[in-house]
């Protein structure tokens, strides 16, 4: 071998070594990437497994939570979350499989194949080089040519392998990012499906917590300066909050023996100490701890003044000031007849001569009842107790030195909102407050007649915000006149009136009721009274209809069971002997103008306020289940499967969607998709089903919005029908999906045994034979279907 050949050989060897070394470097980097990706891939598989474990834990929790007595839909939420977690598991598992198929395995195989080829080429070249060096001179030329040819081939092999490794590296990296892109797209798709459910669950929990916060009993952080409804709501199982009940029991005993109650102020330190005790929620124990009775009356006045709104607003009582003014004019001429008139009061339109001085009492009572009926229930309850205490103090005014005039000055402004926009000169005039004070005096005088004489043992409704507001009914008098008890002169008598204790010999009151009804509070007709009709009286029969009564015969009042307290013929005398007034049964006369109907509102219960939460649960379930049915549309492969889902939508539409549409008189806004006869039948079925899903959700959303805009306090027939329709639709969808899942399991088993596959509804088993026959049979009934079905079936007429 000459020098030139050896030099050329060395150069080629150097090129081969350089390429070989580069290949080894490429392989090292690629191997590192491949190993790291394999670890990441295993992590994704592990995350998929962990997600499945989380889903199983949630499912177990949801099954156990079904036995919990919770208003929060924890069972349904956990069940749905388990499904979401399984979806996430599938997404991670899918990513791991993509990385395995597109990245780690191809890269690993490329490294193995190319590295093996390079090593084989190098080994072959090395063996040939050794044989050439040992060959004889006769074969040297031939061996040299063979070696050079192999050397070129090996170099070309190295170059090809290097290029293959580089291409594989780039393609693998790009494929990995395509896998990530697919992963994130699937994640976004899954999250978009559950995002609305998540928002709805948040809304339900928020609404539930709001209701729970208003309904539950809790230790208040503040009592003074907040709404009276909130104070009553804290102890909804009691007629009065505990601190108010203790205060009134104490005042009942002490006010009749204490001079200047409500007028004399208490010391600042003792007043603040009692206020702080009330704020803390601790028992007051007034009889044992209070030395100064004026401290108790002062803290009651402080509580009343600190209310955001007075018990009676000016715009409420201002229209009744004329009643007080007219009463003052009548009293000037009828002072000597007050005792007789109070004994002969016939509430709301009595028989007798209404033009006389005593006859005006019926009108006064009616107007005062109407005034009280405009107040919220808790305002009525508190006002009654205050007026009873004032009435007691007035009865014992010789000791208390507090007659009605004094009481109207010191306590009236704490109950009735002061007259607004008074000028300085008006305040100095006594006549400015004459009607104001007279109205307060009338309320105290007639406290036992303007308030019902049944117990108020439960203030459940007071805890319900907004609805306790104006509990009214349209009536003037009760179905039978109750005896009027004398004013209580002892705690026992007052207690008997408040609790309805029939054991008291001086009272004839109904037994205590177990729950709060509208009859426990003042219920007055807002219509006008005909004071000139002297021959009729309005009474309420058992069926709730006020009929025109014939003039009652003269009655003789029975002797009172207990003697009334001593009275003097003054305008402040409110003592009333117990009498029994016998009123004959009224005759029915529907054409008389005095005929009135009572439209009593049924009491709202806690469940009435939780109805919107139940509706939100129904709405979430319906939306979710319809979405699951929609997901089956993607898997339709045959016309029969599509017709199976169409029949399912048809059943839902006929039985549930069409009634809702008729209830709302709703017209769909979503336009029908254009259809072409040239399109594939399965594709047309899918498009039709997607459109059906969209208009179904459109109607459901509109119905839900309509329900949310309705009033809880006054539920309409529309809202009741929507609630019932949603409940039934939720049940039928759950049952249908359960049937579909069972059929899927059966079909999967048949597939494993060599049978068919596919997705259909529970009606799909009855669909067989020629597709056109199915289409014809469906089209033949199009004209009799609801608009929702017609939109589906009409577009399949060419199948």
From Swiss-Prot:
Residues 550-568 have a biased composition (Pro residues). It comes from the Eukaryota. It is found in: Cytoplasm. Residues 472-572, 741-799 are annotated as: Disordered. The keyword rRNA-binding does not apply. The keyword Cytoplasm applies. Residues 226-451 form the Rho-GAP domain. One of its GO terms (cellular component) is plasma membrane. One of its GO terms (molecular function) is GTPase activator activity. Its main location: cytoplasm. Residues 525-549, 743-752, 759-791 have a biased composition (Low complexity). Keywords: Cytoplasm, GTPase activation. GO terms for biological process: small GTPase-mediated signal transduction. Residues 472-520 have a biased composition (Polar residues). The record marks 263 as: Arginine finger. SUPFAM superfamilies: BAR/IMD domain-like, GTPase activation domain, GAP. SMART domains: RhoGAP. Rho GTPase-activating protein involved in the signal transduction pathway. PANTHER family: RHO GTPASE-ACTIVATING PROTEIN GACI, RHO/RAC/CDC GTPASE-ACTIVATING PROTEIN. This is Rho GTPase-activating protein gacI. It comes from Dictyostelium discoideum (Social amoeba).
